[in-house]
């Protein structure tokens, strides 16, 4: 039986990752993303890029406002009995009581070379601080923000323009 994977992400940055997992035959059981929000000048309600691609790929998705103290989502994930959760720029901190709900834990794909630029907006912070290089870190999620052990990383040079 294929591993059950939970995917958690929101912005356009996550779309190629979810598409790649799907196209390579990984069993994405459910996607979690931020709920639709008002944006742009007209304050039109827009769904996240991950919700859009989940609909296109016909993957079940959930859009809880928060996971903190959310018994419904906790019970859902407990019942799902997934093997692994992959988190990419989800936009919410995963509560510590959720971290034991998968067999192999939660991993985070973070857009910086940790420990540098923990937290939100690591790409923008690298550019604003004129860093010469940045990268991607894959880490296990712990109960502190972007502080679990790094499993792997990939560095790239930041070029002018």
PLM segments and residue spans:
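One-carbon transfer enzymes
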Residues: 1-161
């Amino acid at each position: 039986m294929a591993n059950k994977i939970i995917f958690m992400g929101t912005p356009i940055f996550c779309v190629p990752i979810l598409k790649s997992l799907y196209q390579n035959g990984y069993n994405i059981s459910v996607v979690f993303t931020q709920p639709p929000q008002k944006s742009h000048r007209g304050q039109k309600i827009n769904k996240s890029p991950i919700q859009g691609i989940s609909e296109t790929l016909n993957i079940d998705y959930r859009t809880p406002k928060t996971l903190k103290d959310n018994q419904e989502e906790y019970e859902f994930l407990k019942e799902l009995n997934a093997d692994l959760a992959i988190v990419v720029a989800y936009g919410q901190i995963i509560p510590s009581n959720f971290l034991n709900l998968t067999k192999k834990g939660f991993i985070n794909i973070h857009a910086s070379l940790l420990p540098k630029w923990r937290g939100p907006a690591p790409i923008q912070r690298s550019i604003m601080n004129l860093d010469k290089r940045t990268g991607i870190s894959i880490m296990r999620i712990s109960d502190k923000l972007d502080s679990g052990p790094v499993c792997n990383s990939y560095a790239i040079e930041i070029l002018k323009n």
